[in-house]
């Protein structure tokens, strides 16, 4: 893991969290229990504080940063998709930020909300609970349905379980030179499917 102290502040990581070895945590970073941090994620606590609360996930290539005297927060069970950027914002409890979305300074994503992939949430946006945000700039399309929230929670559960699985089942290795016979497939822990397959 790449952990760096910055001007005396050292990242804090709960022992039940999983941080991929290629992720970088700098300075004022606080990571809660059961959190999953994916490959190449960057949490730069060299200005503002970066907080991932219990059960949340920050996937591959995500960035968290913010100005001095600000907190960038992903609340409990928050779900941050591949390549998303969070800058000085707050993501509410049980909310999802889709892949390659950008959430700007002072924005608040309401609890149980979903930000669609590739969306841009402008600075200062003040969201409410269970909003579906879409587009660039993002607008409120409608309320999140019970089915969509259930789908989100299954995905988050997969990442909470993945944090546990990675702590024991992930190891650096050398590649094989050919595919072995009867190569097995990996299984998740829920019955979640891509939205297009539902």
Curated annotation (Swiss-Prot):
InterPro entries: CaiE (IPR023446), Hexapep (IPR001451), Transf_Hexapept/Carb_Anhydrase (IPR050484), Trimer_LpxA-like_sf (IPR011004). Keywords: Repeat, Transferase. Belongs to the transferase hexapeptide repeat family. Pathway: Amine and polyamine metabolism; carnitine metabolism. This is Carnitine operon protein CaiE. GO terms for biological process: carnitine metabolic process. The keyword Repeat applies. CDD domains: LbH_paaY_like (cd04745).
